[in-house]
């Protein structure tokens, strides 16, 4: 076996050691979370070796097969696809999870079930690794369902809270809708191609792939919270902050985008699928950016920004640039995890206060967290030479120079501008101005578990984009021929967003509105989506069932058994009685006439 898969699989199997140790039940102590964190850091360091060797060797793909089972028509094997996507993604995911695990030791220290929480986080990571390295649809489906069930368990971690239970159920139900598309695609590939192996599917390259690609797009819509199946993502903020950080950076939500990236050889020749993907991504990125503008919960602002960035990744796949979408997944993981961890630090220090209107002035009291939050927000907006710039700027450039839908491009540019606006708003309310929280709150951000984890991601948010984009192929970019205004478009719309946000803030600083405007209602009520989809159908269903039940009871049983049955019996009997008048003379006369006529007719004549 080649050294690449050997080392990579060693780092992946290292992750299973804490799970195996917990089942053996050798010893239970309070240091288990520390051991798990150390094991993930060890796995990250091991995974760097095969990744660097892979990058510099130039080998495209290495697959390791272990025969699993054979049915009458299908051969299933455990097959790991260690190609460009998985080899780059695994170290990024391990690095981010290592930081989140260390942050969790500080954030969840008072939780009595912290060891169980860490096992769930580790299982979450393992299932994502299965999904990323899978070479057949069955294995990919195991990872796909794994991240779904682990997200359910982690979002509903504080099961004593009704909102957490509702959010966990919402996440699993929306993902079920997406899973229908995935299973439909699996069934199509099995019935038409008799294979779930990715190489065989791409080699055969069927002509009519609209149906399976629509199924895969539906699956990605559910998992990556695209427009229509997006409401579960902001609701998922009911879970602990480390869960939000892991869910939004390198696991669950990027799984849908990763699925479409995996199937890009089929998508690149299908105009229908690409147009739908482009339009879906454009609608999502704009809609969620508008929703983020007026939110007051700090975690929900960051959650909507995640959904907006996922929409941008889907747009990138729609313009047939899967490698760029993948680059954005990798760079986005660093600063998004850091933003959530900074918000967790603020929430924890302010006694679980999440409303940005009740914060303010934190730049002086929490300088390290504030600095990290500002750098993370700048990286999110695509500020030059931070991590986000290396992928986001390229995406906007490529969209500008592509032969693509102008409407989708315009929506993407507006969403990019709004990203700067809501990031500025979050910084303005949270860190600047006078403190608006109670004076007796003790603020302490000096715990090494907190500072070390954020420091690592801070370094990643500044330098990771540079290192990743310079080490992945093509290492030499061909000369671009585009006008300067197209080259600077991403920067122009971002600066415009910053300027617009500050200008509107200053212009409306002393204004008071008695009634909220319609755009404000649309944004703060999330486009009326939860109201329409979560309130109307249940209320209509309840009303219809209540009416039908009452009608059935009243009309069919209560009325028919007593009042209607008595009246019906009386009418029938009265009709029967009134038909017999008792006129005996008339009866005898009619009998006599009938008898006489019959005798006359039947008597033979001589």
Swiss-Prot record:
<protein>
    <recommendedName>
        <fullName>NADH-ubiquinone oxidoreductase chain 5</fullName>
        <ecNumber>7.1.1.2</ecNumber>
    </recommendedName>
</protein>
<feature type="transmembrane region" description="Helical">
    <location>
        <begin position="87"/>
        <end position="107"/>
    </location>
</feature>
<feature type="transmembrane region" description="Helical">
    <location>
        <begin position="171"/>
        <end position="191"/>
    </location>
</feature>
<keyword id="KW-0812">Transmembrane</keyword>
<keyword id="KW-0496">Mitochondrion</keyword>
<feature type="transmembrane region" description="Helical">
    <location>
        <begin position="457"/>
        <end position="477"/>
    </location>
</feature>
<feature type="transmembrane region" description="Helical">
    <location>
        <begin position="325"/>
        <end position="347"/>
    </location>
</feature>
<feature type="transmembrane region" description="Helical">
    <location>
        <begin position="582"/>
        <end position="602"/>
    </location>
</feature>
<keyword id="KW-0679">Respiratory chain</keyword>
<feature type="transmembrane region" description="Helical">
    <location>
        <begin position="114"/>
        <end position="134"/>
    </location>
</feature>
<dbReference type="Pfam" id="PF00361">
    <property type="entry name" value="Proton_antipo_M"/>
</dbReference>
<keyword id="KW-0999">Mitochondrion inner membrane</keyword>
<keyword id="KW-0520">NAD</keyword>
<feature type="transmembrane region" description="Helical">
    <location>
        <begin position="488"/>
        <end position="508"/>
    </location>
</feature>
<comment type="function">
    <text>Core subunit of the mitochondrial membrane respiratory chain NADH dehydrogenase (Complex I) which catalyzes electron transfer from NADH through the respiratory chain, using ubiquinone as an electron acceptor. Essential for the catalytic activity and assembly of complex I.</text>
</comment>
<feature type="transmembrane region" description="Helical">
    <location>
        <begin position="241"/>
        <end position="261"/>
    </location>
</feature>
<dbReference type="InterPro" id="IPR003945">
    <property type="entry name" value="NU5C-like"/>
</dbReference>
<keyword id="KW-0830">Ubiquinone</keyword>
<feature type="transmembrane region" description="Helical">
    <location>
        <begin position="140"/>
        <end position="160"/>
    </location>
</feature>
<feature type="transmembrane region" description="Helical">
    <location>
        <begin position="1"/>
        <end position="21"/>
    </location>
</feature>
<keyword id="KW-1133">Transmembrane helix</keyword>
<dbReference type="InterPro" id="IPR018393">
    <property type="entry name" value="NADHpl_OxRdtase_5_subgr"/>
</dbReference>
<dbReference type="InterPro" id="IPR001750">
    <property type="entry name" value="ND/Mrp_TM"/>
</dbReference>
<feature type="transmembrane region" description="Helical">
    <location>
        <begin position="366"/>
        <end position="386"/>
    </location>
</feature>
<keyword id="KW-0249">Electron transport</keyword>
<dbReference type="GO" id="GO:0015990">
    <property type="term" value="P:electron transport coupled proton transport"/>
</dbReference>
<comment type="subunit">
    <text>Core subunit of respiratory chain NADH dehydrogenase (Complex I) which is composed of 45 different subunits.</text>
</comment>
<feature type="transmembrane region" description="Helical">
    <location>
        <begin position="409"/>
        <end position="429"/>
    </location>
</feature>
<dbReference type="GO" id="GO:0032981">
    <property type="term" value="P:mitochondrial respiratory chain complex I assembly"/>
</dbReference>
<feature type="transmembrane region" description="Helical">
    <location>
        <begin position="301"/>
        <end position="320"/>
    </location>
</feature>
<comment type="similarity">
    <text>Belongs to the complex I subunit 5 family.</text>
</comment>
<feature type="transmembrane region" description="Helical">
    <location>
        <begin position="38"/>
        <end position="58"/>
    </location>
</feature>
<dbReference type="GO" id="GO:0006120">
    <property type="term" value="P:mitochondrial electron transport, NADH to ubiquinone"/>
</dbReference>
<keyword id="KW-0813">Transport</keyword>
<keyword id="KW-0472">Membrane</keyword>
<feature type="transmembrane region" description="Helical">
    <location>
        <begin position="213"/>
        <end position="233"/>
    </location>
</feature>
<dbReference type="InterPro" id="IPR010934">
    <property type="entry name" value="NADH_DH_su5_C"/>
</dbReference>
<keyword id="KW-1278">Translocase</keyword>
<dbReference type="GO" id="GO:0005743">
    <property type="term" value="C:mitochondrial inner membrane"/>
</dbReference>
<dbReference type="InterPro" id="IPR001516">
    <property type="entry name" value="Proton_antipo_N"/>
</dbReference>
<dbReference type="GO" id="GO:0008137">
    <property type="term" value="F:NADH dehydrogenase (ubiquinone) activity"/>
</dbReference>
<dbReference type="Pfam" id="PF06455">
    <property type="entry name" value="NADH5_C"/>
</dbReference>
């Amino acid at each position: 076996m080649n050294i690449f898969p050997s080392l990579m699989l060693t780092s992946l199997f290292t992750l299973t050691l804490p799970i195996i140790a917990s089942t053996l039940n050798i010893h239970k102590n309070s240091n288990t979370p520390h051991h798990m964190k150390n094991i993930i850091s060890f796995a990250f360091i091991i995974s760097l070796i095969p990744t660097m060797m892979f990058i510099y060797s130039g080998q495209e793909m290495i697959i390791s097969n272990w025969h699993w089972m054979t049915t009458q028509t299908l051969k299933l094997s455990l097959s790991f696809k260690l190609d460009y996507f998985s080899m780059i993604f695994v170290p990024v995911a391990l690095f981010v999870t290592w930081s989140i695990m260390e942050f969790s030791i500080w954030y969840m220290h008072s939780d009595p079930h912290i060891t169980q929480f860490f096992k769930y986080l580790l299982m979450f990571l393992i299932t994502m690794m299965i999904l990323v390295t899978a070479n057949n649809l069955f294995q990919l489906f195991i990872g796909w369902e794994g991240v779904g069930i682990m997200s359910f368990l982690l979002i509903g971690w504080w099961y004593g809270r009704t909102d957490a239970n509702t959010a966990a159920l919402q996440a699993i139900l929306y993902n079920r809708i997406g899973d229908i598309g995935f299973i439909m695609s699996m069934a199509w590939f099995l019935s038409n191609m008799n294979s779930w192996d990715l190489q065989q599917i791409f080699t055969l390259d069927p002509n009519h792939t609209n149906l399976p690609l629509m199924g895969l797009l539906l699956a990605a819509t559910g998992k990556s919270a695209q427009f229509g199946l997006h409401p579960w993502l902001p609701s998922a903020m009911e879970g602990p902050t480390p869960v939000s950080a892991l869910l939004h950076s390198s696991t669950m939500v990027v799984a849908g985008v990763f699925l479409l990236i995996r199937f890009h050889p089929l998508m690149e020749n299908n105009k229908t699928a690409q147009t739908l993907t482009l339009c879906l991504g454009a609608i999502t990125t704009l809609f969620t950016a508008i929703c983020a503008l007026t939110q007051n919960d700090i975690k929900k602002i960051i959650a909507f920004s995640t959904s907006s960035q996922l929409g941008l990744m889907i747009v990138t796949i729609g313009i047939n640039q899967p490698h760029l979408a993948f680059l954005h997944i990798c760079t986005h993981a660093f600063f998004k995890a850091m933003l959530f961890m900074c918000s967790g630090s603020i929430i924890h220090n302010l006694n679980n206060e999440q409303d940005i209107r009740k914060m303010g002035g934190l730049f002086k009291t929490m300088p390290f967290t504030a600095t990290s939050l500002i750098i993370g927000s700048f990286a999110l907006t695509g500020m030059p030479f931070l991590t986000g710039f290396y992928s986001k700027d390229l995406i906007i450039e490529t969209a500008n120079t592509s032969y693509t839908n102008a409407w989708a491009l315009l929506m993407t540019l507006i969403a990019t501008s709004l990203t700067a606006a809501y990031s500025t708003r979050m910084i303005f309310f949270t860190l600047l101005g006078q403190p608006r929280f109670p004076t007796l709150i003790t603020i302490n951000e000096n715990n090494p578990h907190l500072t070390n984890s954020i420091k690592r991601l801070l370094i990643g948010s500044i330098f990771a984009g540079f290192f990743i984009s310079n080490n992945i192929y093509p290492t030499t970019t061909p000369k671009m021929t585009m006008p300067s205004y197209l080259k600077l478009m991403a920067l122009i719309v971002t600066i415009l967003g910053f300027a617009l946000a500050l200008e509107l803030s200053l212009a409306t600083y002393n204004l008071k509105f008695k009634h909220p405007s319609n755009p404000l209602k649309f944004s703060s009520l999330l486009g009326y989506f939860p109201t329409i989809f979560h309130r109307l159908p249940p209320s209509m269903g309840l009303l219809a069932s209540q009416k039908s039940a009452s009608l059935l009871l009243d009309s069919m049983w209560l009325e028919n058994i007593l009042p209607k049955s008595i009246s019906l019996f009386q009418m029938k009997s009265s009709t029967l009685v009134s038909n017999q008048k008792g006129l005996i003379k008339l009866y005898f006369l009619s009998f006599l006439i009938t008898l006489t006529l019959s005798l006359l007719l039947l008597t033979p004549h001589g």
